């Protein structure tokens, strides 16, 4: 009996990508083959995103495409929390499950295409199946979020914070390193809250006691000899404790912190920490401890009630903080979000668009000036793409897909996953250019 074949579509954020990796690992362990095409597969699984309207539309379109090309479709992920929305558009899907419903997905697969077990074939590597390139991997440390930001529905979709035991997380990280991963990207909905839900429970790791806590996790990962990058860090005071580890080179001098805005009025409406001056002082203090620190953040413009004065405050804050990387989103109403019930005046779409362009122009200017300062330096760069002696990679200050790149020329052939020293010879708004030495 030939092995059943499953085609897979993974949409959304890195957290959803890790969910997809877990499902695919389960499928491979039961003997299923993963098909690159819908046509010819026994069924298709679509892992959806349901956070923004644009993401919902993309998910519904992907489901429709899978139905057209295959006909047997199982839907999971965040949009799966709203089965009526999916059934209304696509009544012929076989099964719908919400996020993190791994067993339900596997049960649905078993009903459509029962597994063909082959106990003599080892189909799954020890670290599980990864959908990222071999040299980096996402490490998800928790599920859900206990914050109640008014623009967000993640707690409704994924529940409150549930931290994974620290010894389990460290075992997974160790397997990744043993498999050749050179960079671990720590992700969750709220990385700095890690362990709060279980009162920083202690566990044994390599004959010593460690706490399920952001600091302990950072310290232990920092001993594994690979790049460790922290994402989705909420700006709690105890983040300060991790900065010395960055200064010591234990983990990368990189913090991904979604500040969202700088106006106290807007932040209050968002139900976010509303102390932009305090935030600026903390960034300054972090840089005093770790001068090499790169800060990435995301912001929302056009939030209900945002005035021109509020927006100008955000631009002024960018000028003052001079963070290395910043993404910006135009506010989009999310079904079920508290922001819809605040009774605030909506910002016209053309004003949102104009503010977005002004924000991006400001940050581009800041980025250009900061990158110029790296010209002439020699920096370690991890290679993401290689074609003979030409390649593209990233410095310690840049995460994959969302940040800038280093365009490299070399006398010797470059290999994906290698970390090479590059002399930076030129820069532009977002990228660097240099020669491997």
From Swiss-Prot:
One of its GO terms (molecular function) is 4 iron, 4 sulfur cluster binding. Keywords: 4Fe-4S, Cytoplasm, Iron, Iron-sulfur, Metal-binding, S-adenosyl-L-methionine, Transferase. [4Fe-4S] cluster 2 binds at residues 145, 149, 152. Its EC number is 2.8.4.4. Its main location: cytoplasm. Coiled coil: none annotated. Its cofactor is [4Fe-4S] cluster. Catalyzes the methylthiolation of an aspartic acid residue of ribosomal protein uS12. Belongs to the methylthiotransferase family. RimO subfamily. HAMAP family: MTTase_RimO. This is Ribosomal protein uS12 methylthiotransferase RimO. It comes from Brucella canis (strain ATCC 23365 / NCTC 10854 / RM-666).
């Amino acid at each position: 009996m030939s092995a059943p074949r499953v085609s897979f579509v993974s949409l959304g954020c890195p957290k959803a990508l890790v969910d997809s990796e877990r499902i695919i690992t389960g499928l491979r362990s039961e003997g299923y083959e993963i098909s690159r095409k819908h046509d010819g597969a026994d069924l298709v699984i679509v892992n959806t995103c349901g956070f923004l309207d644009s993401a919902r539309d993309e998910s519904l379109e992907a489901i429709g495409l899978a139905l057209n090309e295959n006909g047997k479709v199982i839907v999971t992920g965040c949009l799966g929390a709203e089965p009526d929305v999916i059934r209304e558009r696509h009544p012929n899907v076989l099964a719908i499950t919400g996020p993190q419903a791994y067993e339900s997905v596997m049960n649905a697969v078993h009903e459509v295409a029962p597994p063909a077990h082959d106990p003599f074939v080892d189909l799954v590597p020890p670290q599980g199946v990864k959908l990222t390139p071999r040299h980096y991997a996402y490490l998800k440390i928790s599920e859900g979020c206990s914050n109640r930001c008014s623009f967000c529905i993640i707690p409704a979709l994924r529940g409150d914070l549930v931290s994974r035991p620290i010894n389990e997380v460290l075992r997974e990280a160790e397997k990744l390193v043993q498999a050749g991963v050179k960079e671990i990207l720590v992700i969750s909905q709220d990385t700095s809250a890690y362990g709060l839900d279980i009162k920083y429970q202690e566990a044994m790791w390599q004959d010593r006691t460690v706490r399920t806590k952001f600091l302990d996790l950072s310290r232990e990962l920092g001993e594994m000899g690979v790049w460790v990058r922290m994402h989705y860090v909420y700006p709690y005071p105890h983040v300060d404790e991790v900065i010395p580890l960055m200064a010591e080179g234990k983990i990368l001098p990189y913090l991904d912190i979604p500040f969202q805005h700088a106006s106290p009025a807007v932040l209050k409406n968002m139900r976010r920490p509303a102390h932009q001056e305090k935030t600026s002082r903390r960034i300054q203090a972090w840089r005093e401890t770790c001068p090499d620190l790169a800060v990435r953040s995301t912001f929302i413009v056009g939030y209900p009630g945002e005035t021109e004065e509020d927006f100008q405050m955000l631009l002024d804050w960018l000028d003052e903080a001079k963070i290395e990387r910043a993404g910006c989103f135009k506010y989009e109403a999310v079904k079920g979000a508290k922001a819809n019930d605040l009774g605030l005046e909506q910002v016209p779409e053309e004003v949102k668009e104009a503010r977005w362009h002004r924000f991006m122009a400001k940050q581009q200017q800041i980025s250009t000036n900061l990158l110029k300062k790296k010209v002439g330096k020699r920096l370690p760069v991890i290679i993401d793409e290689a074609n003979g002696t030409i390649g593209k990679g990233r410095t310690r200050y840049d995460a994959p897909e969302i940040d800038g790149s280093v365009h490299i020329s070399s006398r010797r052939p470059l290999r994906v996953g290698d970390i090479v020293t590059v002399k930076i010879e030129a820069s532009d708004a977002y990228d660097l250019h240099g020669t491997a030495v």
